[in-house]
A protein has these predicted regions:
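Non-transmembrane, aqueous-exposed alpha-helical and coiled segments at domain scale
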Residues: 1-339
Length: 339
């Protein structure tokens, strides 16, 4: 506002759970305690946050505006949290009064944006407005259907989108799954097609917008070849109606491109995505496709892509079993090929 910019047109649900400073601290302390057995957390407080939510000791945003409720809820939570912080992690306890002051100040700053978003969204549904829900992470980080326990704490499946947004399930008509032209991951867990050494570093350096590095942590992402087994499973669990594939342009340096079409488990071919203990024993079965050895950036029509690039997309599409409708051919928003 001081710079003359308009206020953001956003609404924050009054029912939203509040991420506390001690959630972040506990996340960091636990990763440090686990050492080499850590889960590869982003140390953003996600697991402690959801733990409090489901133990019903978390705070909803609306409760920050009722001083007595805030104090009572926070005092109860800190009885538990400080016991952990002091006795398990051997750190200084959180000060109740200082935290109340901080939360009260923050609550006033965002007060203009706090609203009954459930009512707002339902009105949008009744008026037939277009609604776009966006999720992060993917199927393999889902706590039920992913590579448990190396997962996140809330479901990244499209089916949970309406739950989080407060709209009827039937109001969602299309589900667009997003995948890269290769595989990448931040965090621990089995990664069947993972690359190492110089081969991995070359792909990592060329990938993403400015290389494959975590948006939150900045740490190097693990990278590998496209995994049709995992992607097919992901699309099935998401109920995807179409796929948007990014980073096609990244692969233009390769003479040939391995694609994982199945796994080998104890000497047998596996075409479905297995549970984590079995996945850890799987080896990739590759088909090698010819590369196109040129820069495809600037191409806007699918038919103008090199023949081998088109064949690569069509091969993945057939293996995954879902139409690839959008192809990202560069980091800019306008570098998308629509099919």
């Amino acid at each position: 506002e001081q710079q003359g910019l308009p206020a953001p047109k956003i609404l924050i649900s009054e029912r939203a759970q509040v991420l506390m400073p001690y959630h972040v601290a506990l996340d960091c302390y636990e990763e440090e305690r686990l050492g080499k057995n850590s889960f590869g957390s982003t140390k953003s407080g996600i697991a402690p946050f959801y733990g409090d939510k489901f133990q019903k000791i978390g705070l909803q945003l609306c409760q920050l505006y009722y001083p007595d409720v805030l104090r009572e809820k926070l005092a109860h939570a800190l009885d538990i949290k400080n016991a952990m912080i002091v006795n398990l992690y051997h750190r200084e306890p959180v000060d109740l009064e200082a935290l109340i002051v901080k939360l009260t100040e923050l609550a006033e700053r965002i007060r203009p944006y706090v609203a009954d978003t459930d009512a707002y969204m339902m009105q949008a549904v009744r008026e037939g407005k277009k609604i776009l829900l966006e999720g992060q992470l993917g199927t393999l980080r889902d706590p039920d259907h992913g590579i448990y326990p190396m997962v996140t704490s809330s479901s990244p499946l499209a089916g949970y989108g309406p739950v989080g947004a407060g709209v009827p399930v039937w109001s969602i008509k299309e589900v667009i799954a997003v995948t890269k032209a290769y595989s990448s991951c931040v965090g621990a867990g089995p990664f069947t097609t993972e690359l190492f050494g110089d081969e991995a570093e070359e792909l990592r350096k060329r990938g993403g917008d400015r290389g494959e590095y975590g948006a939150t942590t900045g740490r190097p992402r693990r990278v590998g070849w496209f995994d049709c087994v995992a992607t097919r499973y992901g699309c099935e669990m998401q109920g995807a109606t179409e796929v948007a594939m990014t980073n096609l342009d990244v692969l233009g340096y390769l003479d040939e491109i391995p694609v994982c079409v199945a796994y080998e488990l104890n000497g047998e071919r596996v075409d479905h995505f297995p549970v984590t203990p079995k996945l850890e024993q799987c080896k990739p079965i590759y088909v090698k496709l010819p590369g196109w050895k040129c820069d495809t950036r600037g191409i806007k029509n699918f038919d103008e892509l090199p023949e081998n690039a088109r064949h690569y997309i069509e091969f993945l599409e057939k293996e995954v079993g879902c139409p690839f409708k959008l192809i990202s051919n560069g980091p800019r928003r306008d570098e998308i090929i629509y099919r």
